[in-house]
């Protein structure tokens, strides 16, 4: 059913005039998530009680999801630590819809990662699908063409009954929406852990490309300019959706009752909306633009007005509806998908509407910019909102939540994995390799990723088997980008500061192994309840670790997202800071793949230092269900050096393949690279080395590289000159169909592939 415009109201409307004369009328502020003191502050701001519509507007905009009221005091540290040198290539940063970075030759890239965790548990398909749609619109709002997506997924234990429901819906939602948009999914992670059983994480990243002169920002400027709402009609779906779902914890009784709060997406509407926006930008028809996501029009109007140089008047009855009888508060706070709001000069309105008609996109003038400082919203001539917009969008409550190192932290850190029995014989080491490879933690993700289109649009250079996704940006010069996202809740649980830096280091390294230069960071910080001092300690430590790490690497945080209340009852998830890193390649033809066997008889070399580090490792998890001790040491100066060597080696043709070492250590990296290249190899461990430590340690800052035989001497000299440890550990044998660890064990590629690829189909097929 479509309804437009709305008919005159048949029920009494709570107007500003009425609110001023009924100061004692009870209002359900608590049911809307507002605290007593927050409600009193709204009354002080307005000098009266809020109308029902104003109350709804403040409640969604002052929610944890929209206002960052518990995290803002800590997030400021990102800005405080970012130097002018780090900002040099940043065209838009924290506070905008997405960060934008100069990548050279007049090109810019915008990228951001956001969460849609809570909706994806309540209704996995639509929760995940609209998570993709929302982050894509953030990228569109910067003036860019979206070119790729990635995802970071966390589910409960792989064999838990509800994991099948959630995983199936989430994967179908991501694939269904992204594939329909024609956007390649170029990477990500899927992790299983019991702590995510009631709180899955669905963090979606989108990357967009634009010419620097096409950059657009969200602001309403110029009195008399028109406000145009365009895209899908507005309905009841998503009322109080992500803004409310993401601002509370779940319990077993109410999670399924929250279904109506999950938005419903239409990827085909979004696809034409993308093309419509790009034509509007190309025609110079847009002054400012804002996508409609969490909190809907309440967010878009207040943010546009507060970022501009005037006020705004909106006629809410002009909003095209698809549901009859909606109240002003429902229209204002609906989170219906595939909608955008633009500021357009009067002389360009007709041209703007004509472009929208061409693309069959519904567009309606709903208001104008004023020369005042108020946001006024009317409903059939009656004023239902009259507020200072900054108090809604930017001046909400800010809390310095109590934080405290958990009493259990010392015991957790003292419980080292060193006490666990270790494999020693060749047979035991072989069994360990197969146990890790055949676990849900390290097995092939092909069952999931094959549901995504990785190469649509034809610009994907690396995706399958790659540490970082690589995209071509400029067909003429070959300029391109590499992106990666990483996280480790287990390491962050052991040490939040170091855990965040380890996630940053791995994402940075995953970009570096493609041959790209890392240039910028985005993040999505997933934690439990901010009302728990232990959670806030984890959060504060992780923020400082990430910010300090970025300073050490010389790359800025361009934006991000915080997701709190990821817990069921008192049980929080593992603290999970997701870090995305963007890198630049001058020529994508020189990118480094993961697969071995590109050159006959390649030499395998291990870069970096291997230490006895197993606390928080997958080995400890799989063999003993153990989590304790201290995470691996992180050396960001060494990470930076490693990236410089890989970039130079890629440029000079000294390396033919590279693969990051992370979970599962060297053994897992060798297996993945051999399977990717469908070639055998022989590994020769150093004589004085402990085979178990060499094969399975998860020490950071290490990369497996394949070096053409003719370039081994030059590459070794390059590493020696720069002080980077480089050890020859074997050769690629294209005539072999086995991975051999000399003197210890041999495993056929067929057995490795079967072990790895059979796990997820058996669990979820």
Curated annotation (Swiss-Prot):
Residues 1-32 are annotated as: Disordered. Its main location: cytoplasm. SUPFAM superfamilies: PurM C-terminal domain-like (SSF56042), PurM N-terminal domain-like (SSF55326). The keyword ATP-binding applies. HAMAP family: PurL_2. Part of the phosphoribosylformylglycinamidine synthase complex involved in the purines biosynthetic pathway. Catalyzes the ATP-dependent conversion of formylglycinamide ribonucleotide (FGAR) and glutamine to yield formylglycinamidine ribonucleotide (FGAM) and glutamate. The FGAM synthase complex is composed of three subunits. PurQ produces an ammonia molecule by converting glutamine to glutamate. PurL transfers the ammonia molecule to FGAR to form FGAM in an ATP-dependent manner. This is Phosphoribosylformylglycinamidine synthase subunit PurL. It comes from Mycobacterium avium (strain 104). The gene is purL.
